[in-house]
Structures are given as C-alpha cells and as structure tokens.
C-alpha cells in the first residue's frame, strides 16, 4: 500500500518538483498526483509549466492566480508590522509560503486528496513553513516531502528525472537557485555560498547597478491609509499595481539590494542575496509615518512586537495563535497611521525627506525654539524632580 492515494503537489516547474511526480508514483506508490502552481507575479509563463506537469505524469495540473491576495492579505499586513527579519530581510519568500499552503489545502479538500506534497529539502526553511501551515489548516492531511528523504544529490535528481523525460533547466553558466515573486527575488547557491565573494552584477534583475542609475534624484510621494499604502504621487493604485510600479521606480535607482548572512530556522547560517525594492521603501516610509502619528509609548512597544512578528513569519507560524494576537495589536495601532511620505531616490539610497498627516502628533508651537514657542519651560523643573526621584533616593542610600 502506498503512502497516499491522491496527492496535491506544490509545483514550480523546476527539476525538484517535476521529479517529485514520478517519484511519488514509482517509489511511494501514490496513485494520483495533482499539481498546483501559484501565480505570485513571478513573471513565468504558467501554461508551459502546466503542460510540463502533465508530461511528467500529473493527472491534473492546476494554476491559481493569487497575486491580489498575496499583496492584500500577506504583504500589506507585513508592511503594517514593519516586518524585517533580522532587521534586514522583508520576508518576500516567507510571506508566500502560507498562501501557497492555504491553496494547497483548499485544493486537497476540493479534489478529495489525502495528502499534500512539496519539493523542499531537509535543509531549508520552506519545509517548515509548508508543513506547519498545512497542518494548522487541516491536521488530517498527510504531508509528503520526497526531497527530504530520497537522499539524491542534485546530479542524481536530474538523472532520475531524465529517465522519465524531465529535462534540467539549470545551466552550468547559471548555477544559482532563484525564487521570485511580486515582492522580490532571492538568489543563493553557486559561488554565492562563499560569503567573501562579491555577487556578480549578472545575478540582479530588479535593481540597476549604481553606475547605470540616473544622475539626478527622483522624488516620490507614497500615501498611506491606516497603515496601508494606497497612492503614488497622489494617484490611487490597486495593491498589485502599486507594488509593481514601486519595484520599477525604486529599482531603477539601484535601491533594494540585500546581501546578508541569515540565521535559518534549521540551525545553520546561509548567505542570502535579495532584491526587494518596493517592500524595503514601503516599510521605511511606513515606519517614518508611524513616528509622526503614534504616541511614544506605542511606537517603542511596537518595535518589540515587530521583531517577534518577523521571527514567527520567517519561522512558518503564520497561522499560529501568537500571530493572530500580534495582528490584533498591530491593527489597533494603525487606526491613525494615514498620511503621505516623501522619498528621495538617488544612487542606491532611499531617503525620507518629508512627511505629513492629518493625524500628526507633531505640534510646531511646542517643538519650535523660536518666538512662537508655547512650551512651558518652568514645568520642566518639577518634572525632572519627580522623574529623577528614584535615582536620587538610590544614590543617597548608596552613599550611606
């Protein structure tokens, strides 16, 4: 008896997920494999991917256009949370995984499958994200991960696929592993595994080299409504179009590259290269607008929430009770985060140069040092006395 009767496989069209189809059937006795490819704005032609799955042995090949949900339900909440894993990575790949898990579970329930499968290895973070998310959404479904068990090298995997007519898309001149969606690109493997190696310019696609960027700065104004980006230069944009336009605008000035040593959930460090122009600038602008519209105590407390939020999303806990609790806090903080942020783009830098809001807590008459100053300077003495009282008492006791 096989490990499952009918399986829905997360499918990308790459060699690993393509090899999973015959492997599940031949080695694990699965009777039927249905593939599901998610259109996350990666730009691939999905019809050839669908056809490749069928040629590889899938009984049915599904394609789901989830771009709008990806931005509205996953990316935008992350912007409200100022989510940057280890203060650098805006979680472009990590945010896609719970959405893919959701549509996998929905497809499994619709087609009567008893298992879900993916092509993740035992070394990465995605296996955790898929397994935990799918289990949270439907604990009754089995999770199959052939690449975690088959023990084949990259070369052996390619050779196995060739026995079933599956060609390898990887060329010797391009050895990198790339994941792409609307939020950006992640690039790893090959020579990049040496952390002292400078990434070659050829790996970048969304961001221009500094030498090729305009010699004049460009100013853009990003409008937010309750923490959600809604306009560019005063023009309302739907979520997908807003991300696409910002990726182009920001990337053309060389902004959006990340080269970092990342602490993976599975306990190892990895060298990761990311391109994420829109997300980086949106988080930077959103955080700046919060500094104008949130009280000091909420702003300071939210920083700790943001770090926890980033960690649990990175670690695959999107559907956890803690994530739901953090969401409730973050949504409450966003009620007054509406306004416009002006950003200067020039030679690889995005600089906030202005911000304004009807909910601004900045009071010019109190902040000024000019003649218009309305701050009661005499009140400071009493405040300082009370504020410093615990320290004064401690000092007196300490000196005996």
Curated annotation (Swiss-Prot):
ATP binds at residues 10-18, 38, 119. Keywords: Amino-acid biosynthesis, Arginine biosynthesis, ATP-binding, Cytoplasm, Ligase, Nucleotide-binding. It comes from the Bacteria. L-aspartate binds at residues 121, 125-126. InterPro entries: Arginosuc_syn_C (IPR048268), Arginosuc_syn_N (IPR048267), Arginosuc_synth (IPR001518), Arginosuc_synth_CS (IPR018223), Arginosuc_synth_type_1_subfam (IPR023434), AS_cat/multimer_dom_body (IPR024074), Rossmann-like_a/b/a_fold (IPR014729). The keyword Transcription does not apply. Its main location: cytoplasm. CDD domains: ASS. It catalyses: L-citrulline + L-aspartate + ATP = 2-(N(omega)-L-arginino)succinate + AMP + diphosphate + H(+). It is found in: Cytoplasm. The keyword Amino-acid biosynthesis applies. GO terms for cellular component: cytoplasm. One of its GO terms (biological process) is L-arginine biosynthetic process. Gene3D superfamilies: Argininosuccinate synthetase, chain A, domain 2, HUPs, Single helix bin. L-citrulline binds at residues 89, 125, 129, 177, 186, 262, 274. Pfam families: Arginosuc_syn_C, Arginosuc_synth. Pathway: Amino-acid biosynthesis; L-arginine biosynthesis; L-arginine from L-ornithine and carbamoyl phosphate: step 2/3. Its EC number is 6.3.4.5. It is an enzyme of class 6 (ligase). One of its GO terms (molecular function) is ATP binding. NCBIfam families: argG, PRK00509.1. Belongs to the argininosuccinate synthase family. Type 1 subfamily. HAMAP family: Arg_succ_synth_type1 (MF_00005). Homotetramer. This is Argininosuccinate synthase. The lineage of its organism: Bacteria, Bacillati, Cyanobacteriota, Cyanophyceae, Nostocales.
């Amino acid at each position: 008896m096989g490990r499952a009767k009918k399986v829905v496989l997360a499918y990308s069209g790459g060699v690993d997920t393509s090899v999973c189809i015959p492997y599940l059937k031949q080695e694990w006795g699965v009777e039927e494999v249905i593939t599901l490819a998610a259109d996350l704005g990666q730009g691939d032609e999905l019809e050839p991917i669908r056809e490749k799955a069928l040629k590889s042995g899938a009984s049915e090949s599904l394609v789901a256009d989830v771009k709008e949900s990806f931005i509205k339900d996953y990316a935008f909440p992350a912007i409200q949370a100022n989510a940057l894993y280890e203060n650098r990575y805006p979680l472009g790949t990590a945010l896609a995984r719970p959405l893919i898990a959701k549509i996998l579970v929905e497809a499994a329930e619709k087609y009567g499958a008893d298992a879900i499968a993916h092509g993740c290895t035992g070394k990465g973070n995605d296996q955790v994200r898929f397994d935990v998310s799918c289990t949270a959404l439907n604990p009754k479904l089995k999770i199959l991960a052939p690449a975690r068990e088959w023990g084949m090298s990259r070369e052996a995997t390619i050779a196995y696929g060739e026995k079933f007519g599956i060609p390898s898309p990887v060329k010797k001149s391009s050895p990198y592993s790339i994941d792409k969606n609307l939020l950006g690109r992640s690039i790893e493997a090959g020579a990049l595994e040496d952390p002292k190696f400078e990434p070659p310019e050829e790996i970048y696609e969304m961001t221009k080299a500094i030498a090729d960027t305009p010699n004049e700065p460009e100013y853009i104004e990003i409008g937010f409504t309750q923490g959600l980006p809604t306009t560019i230069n005063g023009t309302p944009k739907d979520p997908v179009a807003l991300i696409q336009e910002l990726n182009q605008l920001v990337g053309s000035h060389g902004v959006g590259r990340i080269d970092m040593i990342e602490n993976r959930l599975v306990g190892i460090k990895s060298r990761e290269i990311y391109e994420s122009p829109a997300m980086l600038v949106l988080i930077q602008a959103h955080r700046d607008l919060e500094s104008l519209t949130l009280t000091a105590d909420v702003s300071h407390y939210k920083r700790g929430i943001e770090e926890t939020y980033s960690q649990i999303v990175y670690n695959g806990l999107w559907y956890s009770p803690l994530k739901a609790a953090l969401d409730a806090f973050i949504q409450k903080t966003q009620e007054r985060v509406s306004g416009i942020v002006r950003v200067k783009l020039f030679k690889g830098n995005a600089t906030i140069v202005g911000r304004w809001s009807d909910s601004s807590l900045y009071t010019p008459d109190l902040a000024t040092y000019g003649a218009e100053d309305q701050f009661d300077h005499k009140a400071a003495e009493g405040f300082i006395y009370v504020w410093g009282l615990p320290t004064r008492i401690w000092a007196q006791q300490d000196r005996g």
